[in-house]
């Protein structure tokens, strides 16, 4: 199964949102506020850490450090389509 790869991101630390542009040209808004309640992502409540999100090599996900990451597949599924331009 093909999964769309991440091409570009724009981080909004004040609202815990990330715009993600995928290789098929679709941009999705990822609202991380719900994810921050999960123990795995709890450290991302720190805005300084949240804004350090980086695209993994090959566009297969986002990482913040060696311990916190999320796959492109999950981002695609939880994101909402948007016309916002990155």
Labelled PLM ranges:
Residues 1-86:
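Motif-centric detector for short Cys/His coordination patterns
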């Amino acid at each position: 199964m093909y999964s769309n790869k991440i091409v570009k991101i724009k981080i909004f630390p004040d609202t815990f949102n990330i715009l993600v542009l995928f290789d098929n040209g679709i941009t999705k808004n990822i609202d991380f506020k719900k994810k921050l309640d999960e123990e795995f992502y709890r450290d991302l409540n720190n805005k300084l850490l949240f804004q350090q999100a980086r695209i993994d090599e090959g566009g297969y996900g986002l990482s913040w450090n060696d311990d916190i990451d999320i796959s492109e597949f999950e981002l695609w599924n939880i994101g909402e389509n948007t016309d916002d331009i990155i």
